[in-house]
């Protein structure tokens, strides 16, 4: 399809889309939010708003209540500054330098070959639009914009008591209009390290890159139940199955880019005796047919490629290669258990998100999620057992708590009542199998009442990401209704 530049700033509601258009123009992948943060600081100061930044890089912006609303409970509008940097293989894009190129595609806004950053740029845009507005009724207002949510929740981990004064927090990082979230999964990162040993092999060798491509990928929390294929797991399966009958020697393996994204592509550099390159090609063709038979209805674009490579490094020793591929092939992945308490919601899962070959080791990166601590601990035990069998190390880091639902939440009831008043139907009250920052916010602010909501965003964390235009208008209308309905603060 020919790319057509669209002026999304003219979409309705214009205040939100205009800010989102500006956000798209400023690079802000995880770990590189400083340029966008400085833009927002300068903008807030220009509007006469009080703005501060803490040691974690989080931004805090305050706006006084509108006349007559000074006695209402304080509200914190919250979003995160960073976006997931994912692109198609044939897309030339540097996320640290190049702007996102959004365009209108029917009822949606998407981007040209990259993630759009509607997660959480649309929430950020709505927060700024409220700060900028002179015609929205609200009580004492704060905006909290956190850093590096997508790659470690660094800003949420670094948030300290005393910076916020509000009673209610509205997290804008949910992705289905008409749903409101009152709980989320916790998680922990796992890193499994395979020390490398290499050995030279003699003979006439042919060297190839074998690649899994064309998978849908997606968010390892909200999309994990869909059964979308994991490129790292498929590649490990192929290599393990054909390890002996094609006499492959592994040079390097790589796949995925983020723990919290289902990997769409994975590649292995291998060497085979020149006499066996036809056998390898046959194995590739057979596995490609198998993938189409197994996954074709869900993963219509899945392909297996075989191309020559100039990787001239010595292969791994047979012992290291066998141990590595057996572990990757055996590693659990996907849904581990569905919740008994919340029907239709995943309780526990894990995602083999990244495999990297480094100078002295190969590292596999997982993200474990669970609504309950014991579920997370069970999967950690699985990976510890796998590492023990493979005689390698596994490390766990970055654990963050879940967000326990509060059935008596006042802001939840306000959301429900205002939503029904606007749309004459009930919203869906949800618990999400993904990590929202609210669980971490509860540690320094245990008494803060919280919900999460947002417009409809499909395929976050992938180049197919898109946001529904009409849903942004509904979300904006709902946000204004909530702010107007915030009750008077009592002692």
Short names for language-model regions:
Residues 2-108:
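Acidic/His- and Gly-rich active-site-bordering loop/insert found
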Residues 8, 13-16, 340, 347-360, ...:
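Zn-dependent metallopeptidase/amidohydrolase metal-coordination segment
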Residues 27, 107-110, 150-151, 157-369:
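Midchain, well-structured core segments that form catalytic/ion-binding scaffolds
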Residues 69-151, 156-167, 318, 329-333, ...:
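Active-site metal-coordination/substrate-binding segment of hydrolases
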Residues 70-71, 274-283, 373-379:
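Short, conserved charged micro-motifs
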Residues 223, 230-232, 236-253, 405-448:
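Active-site-adjacent substrate-binding region
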Residues 228-245, 274-277, 323-329, 337, ...:
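His/Asp/Glu-rich mid-to-C-terminal helical/loop segments that flank catalytic regions of hydrolases
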Residues 345-434:
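Substrate-recognition/cap regions that form aromatic- and gly/pro-loop-enriched pockets
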């Amino acid at each position: 399809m020919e790319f057509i530049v669209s002026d999304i700033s003219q979409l309705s509601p214009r205040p939100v889309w205009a800010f989102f258009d500006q956000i798209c123009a400023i690079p802000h992948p995880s770990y590189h939010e400083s340029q966008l943060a400085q833009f927002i600081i300068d903008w807030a100061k220009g509007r006469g708003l009080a703005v501060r930044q803490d040691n974690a890089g989080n931004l805090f912006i305050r706006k006084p209540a509108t006349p007559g609303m000074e006695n209402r409970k304080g509200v914190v509008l919250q979003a995160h500054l960073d976006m997931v940097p994912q692109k198609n293989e044939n897309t030339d894009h540097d996320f640290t330098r190049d702007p996102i190129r959004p365009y209108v595609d029917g009822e949606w806004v998407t981007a040209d070959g990259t993630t759009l950053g509607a997660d959480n740029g649309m929430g950020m845009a709505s927060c700024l639009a409220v700060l900028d507005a002179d015609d929205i009724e609200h009580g004492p207002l704060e905006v909290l914009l956190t850093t590096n949510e997508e790659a470690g929740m660094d800003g949420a981990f670094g948030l300290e008591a005393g910076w916020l004064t509000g009673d209610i927090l509205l997290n804008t990082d949910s992705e289905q209009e008409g749903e409101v979230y009152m709980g989320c999964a916790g998680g922990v990162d796992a890193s499994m390290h395979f020390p490398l040993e290499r050995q030279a092999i003699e003979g006439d060798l042919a060297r190839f890159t074998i690649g899994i491509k064309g998978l849908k990928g997606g968010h390892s929390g909200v999309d994990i139940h869909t059964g979308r294929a994991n490129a790292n797991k498929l590649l490990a399966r192929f290599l393990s199955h054909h390890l002996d009958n094609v006499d492959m020697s592994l040079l390097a393996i790589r796949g995925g880019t983020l723990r919290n994204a289902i990997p769409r592509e994975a590649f292995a550099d291998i060497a085979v005796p020149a006499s066996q390159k036809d056998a390898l090609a046959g194995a590739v063709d057979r596995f490609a047919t198998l993938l189409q038979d197994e996954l074709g209805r869900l993963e219509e674009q899945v392909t297996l490629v075989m191309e020559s490579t100039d990787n001239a490094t010595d292969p791994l020793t047979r012992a290291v290669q066998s141990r590595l591929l057996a572990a990757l092939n055996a590693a659990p992945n996907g849904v581990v258990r569905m919740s008994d308490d919340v029907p239709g919601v995943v309780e526990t899962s894990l995602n083999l998100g990244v495999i990297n070959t480094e100078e002295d080791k190969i590292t596999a990166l997982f993200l474990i999620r669970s609504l309950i601590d014991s579920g997370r601990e069970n999967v950690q035990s699985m990976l510890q057992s796998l590492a023990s069998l493979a005689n390698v190390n596994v490390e766990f880091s970055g654990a963050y708590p879940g967000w326990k639902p509060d059935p008596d939440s006042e802001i939840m009831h306000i959301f429900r009542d205002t939503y029904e008043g606007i749309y004459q139907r009930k919203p869906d009250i949800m618990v999400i199998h993904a990590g929202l920052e609210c669980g971490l916010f509860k540690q320094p602010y245990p008494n803060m009442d919280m919900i999460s909501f947002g417009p409809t965003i499909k395929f976050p964390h992938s180049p197919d990401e898109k946001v529904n235009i009409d849903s942004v208008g509904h979300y904006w209308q709902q946000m204004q209704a909530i702010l107007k309905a915030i009750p008077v603060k009592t002692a």
